Design a protein with these regions (language model features):
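Domain-level signal for Mg2+-assisted phosphodiester chemistry and nucleotide/NA-binding surfaces
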Residues: 1-106
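Extended two-metal-dependent nuclease catalytic cores across DNA- and RNA-processing enzymes
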Residues: 3, 57, 85-296, 302, ...
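Acidic, proline-/serine-/threonine-rich low-complexity intrinsically disordered repeat tracts
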Residues: 322-324
Length: 342
């Protein structure tokens, strides 16, 4: 394990690229290969830039969501329960999309010196939180998910992929139907716990019980949350309203420091025992993306990945005997500069 870490919220990046216009995910013939190229290219360019000053003392990690459920759903059944219905009503072939995401992650694990981490019962959030705790140096998180704001400090930085900037306070954001400005991560987290994450993870606000089945949830938005934060005794106020239990429920679901010890131990073990590969040539040959097979770009990829991860050696840097180029990729010879749109 190196001193520093660059960690990607892999699902977050994949979903953003899936919905780009160039991929045409809702069409009858989506550009799956183009999508995978864009995912990898975004990661590579970020690794190259973010790792430039780390002197090779850096691990690059992909944090994946578990394919076997989440511990949060075990304690709160509504957790993300509305996503399946949303996907079933979409024109996107999500089964195929997830297959393509998994294939890319598998190819990276097989060929590159990047750690691909998936832990049964855990989400990318749990993995990234653990990374922020076990790596002693600089940790750089790549995600547009605002949940990671609670981890930001002098050592942990968040690159917001949706606007291409490093996160900093004050932070203007939406919570429920309202908008506010957070001046600290503590304030941001408390508001999130109280108002819930109904549009994101289906976490109800603190006035809504877990077994709620009505047509309209009780309201509790930003104004109510900020007013409660000004209270001299927040716990007493919550108990008086009969919602302290729901507050603790939401804190368990949203506050990353609430990760169960056994899950933290599982992730830590995965981080320590994860094997990486040393075959960038093999990765490039596997996909044969034209813009990365050209001499200058190919050299940049080979030496860039080696430099950031502190690697060198013939298996990484020697040119292969034969270069191949897929004919079906001729139409993508000039990808241009794609951007991840908000």
């Amino acid at each position: 394990m190196k001193n520093n870490a660059i960690v990607f919220d892999f699902s977050n990046l994949c979903q953003r690229c899936l919905h780009l216009t160039q991929v045409a995910a809702e069409s009858e013939n989506p550009s799956w290969d183009l999508m995978k190229f864009m995912i990898f290219d975004k990661m590579f360019e970020f690794v190259l830039e973010a790792g430039a000053d780390l002197d090779g003392d850096c691990d690059v990690l992909l944090a994946l969501d578990s394919h076997s459920g989440y511990w949060r759903r075990d304690i709160y059944p509504p957790y993300k329960a509305d996503r399946a219905a949303k996907r079933s009503n979409s024109k996107i072939d999500y089964a195929r999309a997830f297959q393509e995401f998994s294939e890319l992650a598998g190819a990276i694990k097989e060929h590159l010196p990047w750690k691909v981490i998936e832990v049964q019962g855990c989400e990318a959030d749990d993995i990234i939180y653990t990374v922020s705790k076990v790596y002693p140096g600089t940790v750089m998180i790549h995600s547009s998910d605002s949940d990671y704001i609670q981890l930001v400090d002098d050592r942990v930085r968040l690159f917001r992929a949706n606007d291409g900037n490093w996160f900093r306070f004050p932070y203007r954001y939406k919570a429920g139907k309202g908008k506010t400005v957070a001046l600290s991560k503590e304030e941001f987290l408390e508001v999130a716990i109280m108002t819930g994450q109904s549009g994101k993870d289906n976490v109800y606000n603190i006035l809504t019980d877990t077994d709620w089945s009505g047509l309209r949830k009780p309201g509790f938005g930003i104004v109510a949350a900020l007013k409660l934060l000004d209270s001299d005794d927040i716990k007493a106020e919550l108990e008086a309203r009969g919602c302290f239990g729901n507050y603790l429920r939401n804190k368990k679901l949203i506050d990353m420091t609430e990760l169960p010890e056994e899950e933290f131990a599982k992730i830590s073990e995965a981080l320590n025992s994860c094997d990486t590969a040393n075959d960038v040539h093999g990765f490039l040959e596997y996909y044969s993306w034209p813009s990365m097979m050209s001499g200058q770009k190919r050299e940049e990829v080979l030496f860039g990945i080696a430099g950031v991860c502190g690697l060198e050696g013939p298996s990484l840097l020697e040119e292969p005997e034969n270069e191949t180029k897929s004919d079906e990729w001729e139409k993508f010879d000039d990808f241009g500069d794609f951007t991840l749109e908000a």
